[in-house]
Amino acid sequence: VHPGIDSHLLIQTDSAINPGNSGGPVTQSGQAIGVAFQSNLRLNDVGYFIPVPLINRFLADIKDGRYDGVPEIGIETSSLINQHYRQYLGLPEDTGGILVERVVPHSSADGVLLIGDVLTKIEDLQIDAAGMVRYSEQQVTFFIEAENRQIGDSLQLQVWRKGKFINLTLTLKAAPFGSEMRNSYDELPEYVIFGGLVFIALNRNYIHSPGNMTPPLAYEHWYREIERPR
């Protein structure tokens, strides 16, 4: 099931996952190592499964009987592979880092990170110029450190700002938008008929229904109302 707005760590395997088998255990040497997730119809004998760390994070989340979700840092970044741009920013030669291009309003990073910051370290992991960190002997995106934590946890960051390194702490929050931006499944839409008109909540499912959403209306709602609330 895809929410349509985020992605998380998966493991690719050369064992095909047949339709209908999603949600079953993936085993190796008699031990469960993950949950079957999806196949790739464009490739032969390629499947993906949810790894144990993500499963453990989910189980810890629901211990209180409620699912709070995966926290989001709330930034958009760009790589700093271009050496000339790194020199322009004054970054030391032996420093990696990823450039903060946008901070999502009301997110975990709002009020902590600034546009133009270079994020160089997350917890004890060095971030390279492509935004990757070394995690369990693999190169993965630095967002993995946030995904492994719970909402309300703290995250230690190091950034390059105005020619010097500074250390920051942010408190992880859920994404600053509601369920209306996520795909929903097996749920009938709620609506009200009044005066011959049908009123329905504006959500992702409705927007992706052919012909239901005009570009001006989409812009008005998603940008003005959600990203720039009055």
Identify the residue ranges that each predicted region occupies.
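Extracytoplasmic/periplasmic, Sec-exported soluble proteins
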Residues: N18, V46-I50, G111, P189
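C-terminal, low-ordered peptide segments at domain boundaries
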Residues: A130-G131, Q156-P229
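Terminal peptide-recognition signature
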Residues: T13, G24-V26, G30, V35, ...
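Active-site region of chymotrypsin-like
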Residues: V1-N44, E93-G96, E101
